Amino acid sequence: MTGRFIVLDGIDGCGKSTQIRHLAQWLPASGLMPSTAQLICTREPGGTPLGQSIRELLLHTEADQVPSVTAELLLYAADRAQHVDTVIRPALLRGDWVLSDRFAGSTLAYQGYGRGLDRQLITRLESIATTGLEPDLTAWLMVPVEVSLQRRHGEKEDRIEAEGRAFLRRVADGFAVLAEQRNWSQIDAQQSVSKLSQVLEQTLRETLQ
């Protein structure tokens, strides 16, 4: 595969979506990508038509249809398998670049550390869903839990976002462990939007050039 796979990850409210939009404009003009490559911007869950249906089940489910924690884990794995098989891997094989809002690390952080599910089981499911595909760069956007909650104050929450402070703190701790284990780029996301954009641009240049 000749394309590149870039992931932004972190707890809710870390600024991923804003920076994805920035990088979607910056990357094609940066000189990093071959002139023949396209940039595919995507997300998890919901990066495919099937995945969008799974996203609705995961995040916006009616009270009488909430999945169990095991069913939730398997739905995330199904979303990822479809995403890798039909979007990410084909794009990389074409030589295109893929920029994703979340990937496998989020499942370990949220379902493993947040929910307390067996992390070895999650890792095995990750291997099945991704068939060994790993990002060329994962940037973890670091913000304290209090900052995340403050940024999202007053916004409508999905089912996962509504889990509360203690859950989010466990997830944040999980991301910190994973970032060390998997050698992710760790980026202070408390900076201004423009400064954070500059740091991400430099990180991409240093890693992918």
Curated annotation (Swiss-Prot):
Q: Could you give a GO molecular-function term held by this entry? A: ATP binding
Query: Could you name the Gene Ontology cellular component terms for this entry?
Result: cytosol
- Cited CDD domains: TMPK
- An individual GO BP term: dTDP biosynthetic process
Protein family = Belongs to the thymidylate kinase family.
Q: Which HAMAP family match?
A: Thymidylate_kinase
Protein's job: Phosphorylation of dTMP to form dTDP in both de novo and salvage pathways of dTTP synthesis.
**What name does UniProt use for this protein?**
Thymidylate kinase
Origin species: Synechococcus sp. (strain CC9902)
